[in-house]
Protein backbone atom coordinates (compact mmCIF):
# COMPACT_ATOMS: atom_id res chain seq x y z
CA UNK A 1 0.00 0.00 0.00
CA UNK A 2 1.34 3.40 -1.03
CA UNK A 3 0.45 6.70 0.61
CA UNK A 4 0.93 10.04 -1.13
CA UNK A 5 3.38 12.27 0.73
CA UNK A 6 4.34 15.23 -1.47
CA UNK A 7 5.37 16.43 -4.92
CA UNK A 8 9.05 17.20 -5.46
CA UNK A 9 9.74 19.95 -8.00
CA UNK A 10 12.90 21.05 -9.80
CA UNK A 11 13.59 24.67 -10.65
CA UNK A 12 13.61 24.05 -14.41
CA UNK A 13 12.24 21.53 -16.96
CA UNK A 14 14.31 18.37 -16.74
CA UNK A 15 13.17 15.62 -19.10
CA UNK A 16 9.77 13.96 -19.18
CA UNK A 17 10.28 11.14 -16.65
CA UNK A 18 12.53 10.37 -13.70
CA UNK A 19 12.62 6.59 -13.58
CA UNK A 20 13.88 4.25 -10.85
CA UNK A 21 14.08 6.82 -8.02
CA UNK A 22 16.06 6.07 -4.87
CA UNK A 23 16.26 8.16 -1.70
CA UNK A 24 19.78 7.95 -0.28
CA UNK A 25 20.41 9.09 3.27
CA UNK A 26 23.92 9.66 4.59
CA UNK A 27 24.94 11.23 7.88
CA UNK A 28 25.77 14.63 6.42
CA UNK A 29 23.73 14.71 3.20
CA UNK A 30 20.61 13.33 1.52
CA UNK A 31 20.18 12.60 -2.18
CA UNK A 32 17.46 11.80 -4.69
CA UNK A 33 18.90 9.38 -7.25
CA UNK A 34 17.02 8.70 -10.49
CA UNK A 35 17.31 7.95 -14.20
CA UNK A 36 15.93 10.90 -16.20
CA UNK A 37 14.61 10.43 -19.71
CA UNK A 38 14.28 13.19 -22.30
CA UNK A 39 17.43 15.23 -21.65
CA UNK A 40 19.28 16.78 -24.58
CA UNK A 41 23.02 16.27 -24.88
CA UNK A 42 25.07 19.43 -24.46
CA UNK A 43 28.81 20.01 -24.19
CA UNK A 44 29.49 16.30 -23.59
CA UNK A 45 26.83 16.07 -20.87
CA UNK A 46 23.98 13.54 -21.17
CA UNK A 47 25.48 11.66 -24.13
CA UNK A 48 23.60 8.40 -23.45
CA UNK A 49 20.01 7.96 -24.60
CA UNK A 50 18.94 7.98 -20.92
CA UNK A 51 20.89 9.25 -17.94
CA UNK A 52 21.51 8.34 -14.33
CA UNK A 53 22.46 10.66 -11.50
CA UNK A 54 21.32 12.45 -8.40
CA UNK A 55 20.01 15.66 -6.90
CA UNK A 56 21.65 16.66 -3.60
CA UNK A 57 18.92 17.74 -1.17
CA UNK A 58 19.06 20.72 1.15
CA UNK A 59 17.36 18.72 3.91
CA UNK A 60 15.36 15.52 4.48
CA UNK A 61 12.92 14.62 1.72
CA UNK A 62 10.08 14.61 4.23
CA UNK A 63 10.71 18.30 4.96
CA UNK A 64 10.61 21.34 2.67
CA UNK A 65 13.72 20.30 0.80
CA UNK A 66 15.07 21.89 -2.37
CA UNK A 67 16.69 19.89 -5.15
CA UNK A 68 20.17 21.17 -5.90
CA UNK A 69 21.75 20.88 -9.36
CA UNK A 70 21.62 17.42 -10.95
CA UNK A 71 24.94 15.54 -11.07
CA UNK A 72 25.43 12.83 -13.69
CA UNK A 73 26.79 9.80 -11.83
CA UNK A 74 27.94 7.03 -14.16
CA UNK A 75 29.02 7.83 -17.72
CA UNK A 76 29.09 4.28 -19.07
CA UNK A 77 27.61 3.21 -22.39
CA UNK A 78 25.30 0.76 -20.60
CA UNK A 79 24.13 1.68 -17.12
CA UNK A 80 20.56 2.20 -15.92
CA UNK A 81 18.01 1.49 -13.22
CA UNK A 82 20.45 1.39 -10.33
CA UNK A 83 19.19 -0.01 -7.04
CA UNK A 84 20.64 0.64 -3.58
CA UNK A 85 20.59 -1.15 -0.25
CA UNK A 86 22.49 -1.19 3.02
CA UNK A 87 24.27 -4.42 3.85
CA UNK A 88 24.96 -6.02 7.22
CA UNK A 89 28.14 -3.93 7.52
CA UNK A 90 26.20 -0.70 7.11
CA UNK A 91 27.61 0.00 3.66
CA UNK A 92 25.49 1.57 0.93
CA UNK A 93 25.65 -0.94 -1.95
CA UNK A 94 24.57 -0.30 -5.53
CA UNK A 95 24.04 -2.52 -8.55
CA UNK A 96 22.80 -1.44 -11.95
CA UNK A 97 21.46 -2.85 -15.18
CA UNK A 98 24.30 -3.11 -17.70
CA UNK A 99 21.99 -2.28 -20.57
CA UNK A 100 19.67 0.41 -21.88
CA UNK A 101 16.13 0.37 -23.27
CA UNK A 102 15.05 1.83 -26.61
CA UNK A 103 18.44 1.70 -28.29
CA UNK A 104 19.68 -0.09 -31.40
CA UNK A 105 22.71 -2.12 -30.41
CA UNK A 106 23.79 -5.25 -32.25
CA UNK A 107 24.80 -7.33 -29.25
CA UNK A 108 26.02 -10.69 -30.62
CA UNK A 109 24.46 -12.63 -27.72
CA UNK A 110 20.95 -11.76 -28.95
CA UNK A 111 21.23 -14.70 -31.35
CA UNK A 112 21.73 -16.90 -28.28
CA UNK A 113 18.59 -15.53 -26.64
CA UNK A 114 20.29 -13.37 -24.04
CA UNK A 115 21.86 -9.96 -23.51
CA UNK A 116 22.77 -7.48 -20.75
CA UNK A 117 24.01 -8.18 -17.22
CA UNK A 118 24.38 -6.70 -13.76
CA UNK A 119 27.17 -4.24 -13.15
CA UNK A 120 29.70 -4.99 -10.49
CA UNK A 121 28.31 -4.36 -7.04
CA UNK A 122 29.69 -1.07 -5.77
CA UNK A 123 30.02 0.64 -2.42
CA UNK A 124 28.62 4.18 -2.43
CA UNK A 125 30.11 6.82 -0.18
CA UNK A 126 29.49 10.53 0.36
CA UNK A 127 32.15 13.21 0.58
CA UNK A 128 31.58 16.97 0.63
CA UNK A 129 28.13 16.69 -0.91
CA UNK A 130 28.99 14.29 -3.74
CA UNK A 131 28.60 10.54 -4.22
CA UNK A 132 31.49 8.22 -5.01
CA UNK A 133 31.48 4.59 -6.13
CA UNK A 134 33.99 1.76 -6.20
CA UNK A 135 33.63 -2.03 -6.47
CA UNK A 136 33.04 -3.77 -3.16
CA UNK A 137 36.18 -5.14 -1.51
CA UNK A 138 34.90 -8.73 -1.69
CA UNK A 139 35.98 -8.89 -5.34
CA UNK A 140 39.57 -8.97 -4.09
CA UNK A 141 39.01 -12.60 -3.09
CA UNK A 142 38.73 -13.49 -6.80
CA UNK A 143 42.26 -12.34 -7.57
CA UNK A 144 44.74 -14.95 -8.75
CA UNK A 145 48.04 -14.36 -10.56
CA UNK A 146 49.55 -10.87 -10.28
CA UNK A 147 51.65 -9.19 -12.97
CA UNK A 148 53.39 -5.82 -12.81
CA UNK A 149 54.81 -3.90 -15.78
CA UNK A 150 56.30 -0.45 -16.22
CA UNK A 151 56.97 1.39 -19.46
CA UNK A 152 56.05 -1.52 -21.71
CA UNK A 153 53.05 -3.32 -23.19
CA UNK A 154 51.50 -6.43 -21.67
CA UNK A 155 49.96 -9.33 -23.55
CA UNK A 156 47.62 -11.68 -21.69
CA UNK A 157 45.87 -14.87 -22.75
CA UNK A 158 42.62 -13.97 -21.00
CA UNK A 159 39.94 -11.31 -21.28
CA UNK A 160 39.06 -11.58 -17.57
CA UNK A 161 41.24 -9.38 -15.41
CA UNK A 162 41.46 -6.48 -12.96
CA UNK A 163 43.94 -3.79 -13.96
CA UNK A 164 45.31 -0.88 -11.91
CA UNK A 165 47.15 1.93 -13.69
CA UNK A 166 48.88 4.43 -11.42
CA UNK A 167 50.79 7.71 -11.78
CA UNK A 168 49.01 8.69 -14.98
CA UNK A 169 50.57 11.54 -16.98
CA UNK A 170 48.66 14.74 -17.78
CA UNK A 171 47.70 13.24 -21.13
CA UNK A 172 47.77 9.62 -22.30
CA UNK A 173 46.41 7.09 -24.79
CA UNK A 174 45.39 3.53 -24.00
CA UNK A 175 44.36 0.74 -26.36
CA UNK A 176 42.65 -2.22 -24.71
CA UNK A 177 40.61 -5.03 -26.29
CA UNK A 178 39.72 -2.96 -29.35
CA UNK A 179 38.78 0.09 -27.28
CA UNK A 180 40.71 3.35 -27.63
CA UNK A 181 40.95 5.75 -24.68
CA UNK A 182 42.44 9.21 -24.91
CA UNK A 183 42.83 11.68 -22.05
CA UNK A 184 43.79 15.27 -22.81
CA UNK A 185 42.92 18.71 -21.41
CA UNK A 186 40.61 17.26 -18.77
CA UNK A 187 38.57 15.18 -21.23
CA UNK A 188 38.53 11.38 -21.41
CA UNK A 189 37.38 10.09 -24.80
CA UNK A 190 36.41 6.43 -25.18
CA UNK A 191 36.00 5.02 -28.69
CA UNK A 192 34.53 1.52 -28.85
CA UNK A 193 35.23 1.08 -32.58
CA UNK A 194 33.91 -2.19 -34.03
CA UNK A 195 33.97 -3.89 -30.64
CA UNK A 196 31.07 -1.70 -29.47
CA UNK A 197 28.28 -3.46 -31.42
CA UNK A 198 26.68 -0.09 -32.11
CA UNK A 199 28.27 1.82 -29.25
CA UNK A 200 30.40 4.66 -30.58
CA UNK A 201 32.23 7.42 -28.74
CA UNK A 202 31.68 8.89 -25.27
CA UNK A 203 33.33 11.81 -23.52
CA UNK A 204 33.75 12.29 -19.78
CA UNK A 205 34.99 15.55 -18.27
CA UNK A 206 37.55 14.71 -15.57
CA UNK A 207 39.68 17.66 -14.43
CA UNK A 208 42.50 15.40 -13.19
CA UNK A 209 43.23 11.68 -13.43
CA UNK A 210 45.84 10.16 -11.12
CA UNK A 211 44.97 6.49 -11.52
CA UNK A 212 42.57 4.15 -13.25
CA UNK A 213 41.11 0.76 -12.38
CA UNK A 214 39.58 -1.51 -15.02
CA UNK A 215 37.53 -4.67 -14.58
CA UNK A 216 37.28 -6.79 -17.72
CA UNK A 217 35.43 -9.98 -18.54
CA UNK A 218 34.50 -11.68 -21.79
CA UNK A 219 31.78 -9.19 -22.75
CA UNK A 220 32.21 -6.04 -20.67
CA UNK A 221 34.66 -3.46 -19.44
CA UNK A 222 34.06 -1.33 -16.33
CA UNK A 223 36.32 1.65 -15.74
CA UNK A 224 36.83 3.52 -12.46
Where does each model-flagged region fall?
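Short loop/turn motifs that recur once per blade in beta-propeller domains
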Residues: 8-16, 71-76
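Beta-rich catalytic cores
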Residues: 17-20, 78-80
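Beta-rich accessory regions
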Residues: 50-224
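Acidic, glycine-rich loop-and-beta core segments that form the ion-binding/anion-interacting portion
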Residues: 26-27, 36, 43-61
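Solvent-exposed, flexible loop/coil residues
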Residues: 12, 22, 118, 122
Amino acid sequence: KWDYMKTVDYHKPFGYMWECPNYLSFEKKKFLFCCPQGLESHNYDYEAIYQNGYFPLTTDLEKDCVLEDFIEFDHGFDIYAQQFFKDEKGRMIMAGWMGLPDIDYTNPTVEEGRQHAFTLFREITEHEGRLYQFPIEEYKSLREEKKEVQGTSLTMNTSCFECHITDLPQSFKLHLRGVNMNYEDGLLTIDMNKSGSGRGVKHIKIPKMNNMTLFSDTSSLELF
